Amino acid sequence: MALLSFERKYRVPGGTLIGGSLFDFWVGPFYVGFFGVTTIFFATLGFLLILWGAAMQGTWNPQLISIFPPPVENGLNVAALDKGGLWQVITVCATGAFCSWALREVEICRKLGIGFHIPVAFSMAIFAYLTLVVIRPMMMGSWGYAFPYGIWTHLDWVSNTGYTYGNFHYNPFHMLGISLFFTTAWALAMHGALVLSAANPVKGKTMRTPDHEDTYFRDLMGYSVGTLGIHRLGLLLALNAVFWSACCMLVSGTIYFDLWSDWWYWWVNMPFWADMAGGING
């Protein structure tokens, strides 16, 4: 890929966290760095271990390949490779690759002298992953409660985990997370549509300005968050969507153990209508 004209002045030494100048170089448009090397190492090793697991399983169908965690009765012990140990090693590789990628993002931010918003945002995704495969299983006392690495099997795990607690649709944290995901998609669609409409005015008109964009939303809903504000809002919505989605799993089986539909009886038994004749309680 060609080096863009403005990029060369930003390719300066320094800003590394580990390794000094040893890996402080670029390959084409890609910055390497120490954590780029560790990302490649962990990702490659994890991928090869998945292939090994597929060979042990006896299938090369991507939809059927599945690496299962150790059985629940194994607890938090290290398992044999063919009894879930392979899943444990792949989890270490995935965690190492994700964290290395985030730290590589930190080094790039340091080189450019910009804020750490991108690695912070990516770290929220890492937190969600670790919640499912490390934090929640450790709180429940067994790696067997983590999800398997497979297309269909991980979907089965999602379904089974949801129905273990009655119906996850009644999980208030699940409600909040899903609502925020929908809101994030809505905000992104509105923002993207607004920018494209300003950049592609009707024939004969010049490109519109941010003032036009602000005025549109003030006319539409009485307020415009602004060109910078919409990106702050989008980041806030997206981070909260991931955080509360992780929380909906984290509290299930660790803090709350019953059916999520039963959790809502506090609403049914509120004094406003609990004893009302013909009311919600009959």
Curated annotation (Swiss-Prot):
One of its GO terms (biological process) is photosynthetic electron transport in photosystem II. CDD domains: Photo-RC_L. GO terms for molecular function: bacteriochlorophyll binding; electron transporter, transferring electrons within the cyclic electron transport pathway of photosynthesis activity; metal ion binding. The keyword Iron applies. Fe cation binds at residues 191, 231. The chain crosses the membrane at residues 33-56, 85-113, 116-141, 171-200, 226-252. A ubiquinone binds at residue 217. Signal peptide: none annotated. GO terms for cellular component: plasma membrane light-harvesting complex; plasma membrane-derived chromatophore membrane. It is found in: Cellular chromatophore membrane. (7R,8Z)-bacteriochlorophyll b binds at residues 154, 174. It comes from the Bacteria. Keywords: Bacteriochlorophyll, Chlorophyll, Chromophore, Electron transport, Iron, Magnesium, Membrane, Metal-binding, Photosynthesis, Reaction center, Transmembrane, Transmembrane helix, Transport. It is a multi-pass membrane protein. Reaction center is composed of four bacteriochlorophylls, two bacteriopheophytins, two ubiquinones, one iron, and three highly hydrophobic polypeptide chains (designated L, M, and H). Belongs to the reaction center PufL/M/PsbA/D family. The reaction center is a membrane-bound complex that mediates the initial photochemical event in the electron transfer process of photosynthesis. This is Reaction center protein L chain. It comes from Rhodobacter capsulatus. The lineage of its organism: Bacteria, Pseudomonadati, Pseudomonadota, Alphaproteobacteria, Rhodobacterales. The gene is pufL.
